[in-house]
Amino acid sequence: MSVTKAAVKAVHLGRISYHSALKIQQQHIQQHLDSSSNIPNTLLLCEHEPVYTIGLRQAPYPPAEEQRLKALGADFCRTNRGGLITFHGPGQLVCYPILNLGCFKKSVRWYVCELERTVIKMCGKFGIKASTSPDTGVWVGDNKICAIGIHCGRYITSHGLALNCNTDMSWFDNIVPCGIVGKGVTSLSQELERDVPPDEAIPKLLEAFTEQFNCTLTYNGSLS
């Protein structure tokens, strides 16, 4: 007997503010929680204006440090995702899966591992050998290429992953990314020694997601 695959819809939001993306996520989450709604599982794809965000594990961030980061021209936002401080900005492909894990597997640990495997598989499609480490995320050697921080309530996921494509990496010089001392950051462009914009990464990411999560996927943009 064949098993029906979960259906996922990918939506490209373009470049939007972090706060706008949070509102869109909350709308999708609420629709999932509304028993009368039949909203599909969704991947929200976007880039952000420069913003530093901190997660639930972050100790109270010193006001002086917050002001220092804002003075650089970035926004600053506290979130309910897992993890510590990171940066989002132009040239970084951000993917927010709003999924009902009941359609997949009701395990947050499984879900995070599948996100990591998705990005590793996507990197492989570019010819980049990536891996996991004891620290959440995806790495190329000792350099993080993709940060992962999620939230899950009543098995509905939000937040997600941030893949460095052709990001201005100097933004990371102002923080200790994800609170991990002694490690660096990298991007698809750095690893391939050519410009790789987010739009080039989207088809490979969606292909890898479809394979890893064993789902059907529709996309409102061109995959060519």
From Swiss-Prot:
EC number: 2.3.1.181
Main localization (coarse): mitochondrion
Biological process annotations from GO: positive regulation of oxygen metabolic process; protein lipoylation
Pathway listed: Protein modification; protein lipoylation via endogenous pathway; protein N(6)-(lipoyl)lysine from octanoyl-[acyl-carrier-protein]: step 1/2
Pfam family, one: LplA-B_cat
Compartments where located: Mitochondrion
EC top class, as a word: transferase
Catalysed reactions listed for this entry: octanoyl-[ACP] + L-lysyl-[protein] = N(6)-octanoyl-L-lysyl-[protein] + holo-[ACP] + H(+)
Residues the entry annotates as binding substrate: 81-88, 147-149, 160-162
List of catalytic residues: 178 (acyl-thioester intermediate)
Keywords: Acyltransferase, Ligase, Mitochondrion, Transferase, Transit peptide
Domain BPL/LPL catalytic: 37-217
Keyword ATP-binding part of the UniProt annotation: no
InterPro entries associated with the record: aa-tRNA-synth_II/BPL/LPL, BPL_LPL_catalytic, Octanoyltransferase, Octanoyltransferase_CS
HAMAP family referenced in this protein's UniProt entry, alphabetically: LipB
Physiological role: Catalyzes the transfer of endogenously produced octanoic acid from octanoyl-acyl-carrier-protein (octanoyl-ACP) onto the lipoyl domains of lipoate-dependent enzymes such as the protein H of the glycine cleavage system (GCSH). Lipoyl-ACP can also act as a substrate although octanoyl-ACP is likely to be the physiological substrate.
Other observations noted: In the reaction, the free carboxyl group of octanoic acid is attached via an amide linkage to the epsilon-amino group of a specific lysine residue of lipoyl domains of lipoate-dependent enzymes.
Family note: Belongs to the LipB family.
The protein's name in its UniProt record: Octanoyl-[acyl-carrier-protein]:protein N-octanoyltransferase LIPT2, mitochondrial
Species whose genome carries this gene: Danio rerio
GN (gene name): lipt2
